[in-house]
Design a protein with these regions (language model features):
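Alpha-helical scaffold elements lining the catalytic groove of polysaccharide deacetylases
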Residues: 1-22, 33-78, 91-97
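Conserved, mostly hydrophobic/aromatic
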Residues: 12, 27, 46, 82, ...
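Surface-exposed helix-capping loop/turn segments at secondary-structure junctions
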Residues: 18-24, 105-109
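Low-complexity, flexible helical/coil segments
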Residues: 26, 61-64, 81-89, 116-124
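A generic alpha-helix propensity feature with a strong bias for hydrophobic helices
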Residues: 27, 32-33, 103, 127
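Active-site-proximal beta-strand/loop segments in catalytic clefts of secreted hydrolases
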Residues: 28-32, 49-52, 84-88, 112-115
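C-terminal domain-boundary segment and adjacent tail
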Residues: 90-131
Length: 131
């Protein structure tokens, strides 16, 4: 329900702010499950992903790395939002390999807010969905 979603978003925002001292400025719905009511209620830009590494499923650093590298090798990574989950240790291992590899191969890593400005030429808008 929308009430449950609002409670979950509020609790998450509070936890993030308590942990790092800054409130979230963007919102990624769990599992990508959202609708217009939730998007409006979140009062943040809604960020979806364009590359799913399936890291949550494989829990394998090399497979996660290979997934992103394959997209890059196919020329399908520029300007994309890569979904990875920080709760899995192998994802951290993949990230340690990916960041240097991406930089060595000419990629610039930016926040999703910066990406929206580059791709859309606008500041991220609350309630608007971005891929």
């Amino acid at each position: 329900s929308t009430d449950q979603a609002k409670e979950q978003i509020t609790k998450t925002n509070n936890a993030v702010e308590a942990a790092c001292g800054s409130a979230p400025t963007v919102f990624r719905p769990c599992y990508g499950a959202t609708n217009d009511s939730i998007n409006a209620m979140a009062q943040m830009p809604v960020i979806m992903w364009t590359v799913d590494t399936l890291d949550w499923k494989t829990k394998d650093a090399q497979k996660t790395f290979d997934c992103v590298k394959a997209k890059a090798d196919q020329g399908k990574l520029d300007g994309k939002i890569v979904l990875m989950h920080s709760i899995h240790e192998p994802t951290a291992g993949a990230t340690e390999k990916l960041i240097p590899w991406l930089k060595e191969n000419g990629y610039q890593l930016v926040t999703v807010s910066e990406l929206i400005k580059y791709k859309k030429g606008e500041d991220p808008q609350n309630g608007k969905v971005y891929y």
